[in-house]
């Protein structure tokens, strides 16, 4: 495979994503490519895309194309909250995630942990649109009702687990690619049930939106493996959330920092 440069990747993305009413802006300092359509903007980090391309080839670019196209489609999608309560879900994002749209509309959001925030989304099938506070006023629906619908729908989602083990430490993965894998972190009944099944310390990670990792950690090797795993997923994710795992104790999630071969204090 020929070496992919920043310029080559920029040109390929522009070619693949070219469409009417769509503009491109390249930031040389940050190596980012911004795509704007009808007032909506998506920004891509080219070095990250190149790294994924070197691992996965054209599949990495296809994922980016899909992500951008679905994002613009979601932004233009019509949302009717009151008659479609079953389409409302909570989604987890980093605390640094913007709380306003580019047009100044404030997104409906709740605090969660020091590393994560809860937003609310309207499912559009292959993508979703974040719910804006102004939508609630237009449809005469409250924040409490949105929360109730969202968490009721979350509780109905299947949670298939794939297990892997390293030196007596078990790791469970949720990767359905339905857009709500990280959201399963908010399912309190699921977390409680998992805590009862595990014998070691329960540590969870949501490095990006399409994966939830649960570790049954028995020793320092387990923490080390989880730390490396979380960083790898965080670097590869289209929508990164946090590289810090969480310890689950007494129904609460506390972020921790793990160094190789050692577990640091919370």
UniProtKB/Swiss-Prot annotation:
Region forming the signal peptide: none
Pfam family of the protein (one): DUF1444
InterPro entries (alphabetical): DUF1444 (IPR010838)
Family: Belongs to the UPF0354 family.
Record-given protein name: UPF0354 protein lwe1624
């Amino acid at each position: 495979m020929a070496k992919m440069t920043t310029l080559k990747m920029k040109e390929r993305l522009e070619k693949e994503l070219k469409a009417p009413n769509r503009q491109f802006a390249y930031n040389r300092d940050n190596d980012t490519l911004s795509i704007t359509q009808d007032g909506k903007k998506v920004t891509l980090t080219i070095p990250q895309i190149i790294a994924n391309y070197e691992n996965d080839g054209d599949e990495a670019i296809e994922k980016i194309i899909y992500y951008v196209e679905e994002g613009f489609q979601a932004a233009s999608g019509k949302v009717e909250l009151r008659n479609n309560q079953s389409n409302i879900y909570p989604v987890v994002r980093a605390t640094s995630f913007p709380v306003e749209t580019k047009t100044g509309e404030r997104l409906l959001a709740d605090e969660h942990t020091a590393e994560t925030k809860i937003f609310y989304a309207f499912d559009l099938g292959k993508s979703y649109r974040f719910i804006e506070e102004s939508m609630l006023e237009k449809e005469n629906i409250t924040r409490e009702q949105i929360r109730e619908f969202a968490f009721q729908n979350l509780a109905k989602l299947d949670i298939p687990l794939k297990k892997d083990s390293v030196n007596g430490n078990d790791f469970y993965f949720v990767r359905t690619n339905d857009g709500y894998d990280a959201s399963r972190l908010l399912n309190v009944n699921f977390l409680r049930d998992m805590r009862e099944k595990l014998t070691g310390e329960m540590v969870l990670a949501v490095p990006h939106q399409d994966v939830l990792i649960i570790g049954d950690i028995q020793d320092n090797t387990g923490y080390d493996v989880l730390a490396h795993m979380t960083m790898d997923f965080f670097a590869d994710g289209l929508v990164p959330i946090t590289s810090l795992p969480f310890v689950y104790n007494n129904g609460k999630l506390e972020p921790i920092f793990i160094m190789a071969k050692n577990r640091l204090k919370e």
